[in-house]
């Protein structure tokens, strides 16, 4: 329930892709109707951020905490894991960047589990929210990939 996976090859090196996907304050550029709030300081294990999504007074916070943090070094692989600890959403995300094509491209692997709380409501809504999340995140990740490719000066890999 609530788990989806997206894999994408990005025409940019792993460190460039990493910089884009871990620009937590910037996630509002890609996630519709969302503004971000982040802990001060650099990202690290235990660091938290949240996406506040909605319109007007109808908003909810997706609060997340980093549980694993391993940025890529010198064109190598990187990964992070987070857990969702907010009132309305449970789940986790595991994201990896892997060098391909002599480090000129990146294989981006994004697995995420999103469950509406309370859990019985999440089970009921799961079939709908799973489809919506897969579509929204495919678009979000495509936009992130395009930004990373643009920053790297590479042609877009398409959507």
Predicted regions, residues:
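Hydrophobic pocket/interface hotspot
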Residues: 17-21, 27, 49, 66, ...
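Helix-adjacent hinge/juxtasegments
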Residues: 58-69, 81-84
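Short beta-strand segments that buttress and anchor functional surface loops
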Residues: 48-55, 79-86
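Short, surface-exposed coil-to-beta transition loops
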Residues: 3-5, 59-64, 89-94
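Hydrophobic ligand-binding cavity/cleft-lining segments
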Residues: 1-44, 159
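Beta-strand elements of well-folded, non-transmembrane domains
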Residues: 12, 55-57, 114-116
């Amino acid at each position: 329930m609530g788990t989806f996976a997206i894999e994408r090859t990005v025409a940019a090196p792993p460190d460039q892709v990493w910089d884009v996907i871990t620009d937590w304050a910037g996630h509002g550029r890609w996630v519709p109707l969302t503004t971000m709030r982040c802990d001060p300081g650099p990202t690290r294990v235990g660091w938290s951020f949240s996406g506040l999504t909605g319109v007007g007074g109808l908003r909810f916070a997706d609060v997340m905490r980093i549980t694993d943090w391993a940025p890529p070094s010198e064109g190598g692989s990187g990964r992070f894991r987070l857990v969702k600890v907010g009132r309305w959403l449970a789940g986790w995300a595991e994201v990896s960047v892997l060098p391909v094509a002599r480090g000129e491209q990146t294989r981006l692997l994004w697995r995420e589990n999103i469950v509406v709380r309370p859990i019985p409501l999440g089970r009921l809504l799961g079939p709908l929210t799973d489809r919506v999340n897969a579509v929204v995140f495919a678009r979000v990740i495509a936009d992130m990939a395009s930004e990373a490719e643009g920053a790297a000066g590479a042609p877009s890999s398409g959507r």
